[in-house]
A protein has these predicted regions:
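Long, contiguous binding/interaction regions
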Residues: 1-56, 62-106
Length: 106
């Protein structure tokens, strides 16, 4: 399980601004930027107790246009840390932003 500090250390390596869950109103930087959150867990149990804690970690990359180089930079950081992830992408019309979502367990 990665600690909060370890996760933020990884995100710092991208050189992009980031925040947990969301940026405060009026504080959102210009894209590209990252948002991360831990929306739940998939803990492993033994004898009716949590034997091994496994948190979900979502990292969202927001850009105003498709930016494969930013995706590659984030993926290199995740790969170097040995994290397995799944990736999806969508365009958020109301925000005029692309979101690339990286989902993993830590």
């Amino acid at each position: 399980m990665l600690s909060y500090e370890q996760i933020t250390d990884l995100l710092r390596q991208t050189g992009l601004p980031f925040a947990y869950h969301h940026f405060s109103e009026g504080e959102s930087p210009d894209p590209p930027f990252l948002v991360y959150l831990t929306p739940g867990s998939h803990n492993f149990s033994a004898d009716g107790m949590v034997y091994c804690r496994v948190d979900q970690l979502d990292i969202e990359l927001y850009t105003d246009k498709k930016q494969p180089e930013q995706e590659a930079k984030l993926e290199a950081v995740l790969d170097e840390a040995g994290l397995f992830y799944n990736k999806t992408e969508q365009f958020i019309r109301s925000e005029q932003l692309y979101e690339v979502l990286y989902e993993m367990e830590v």
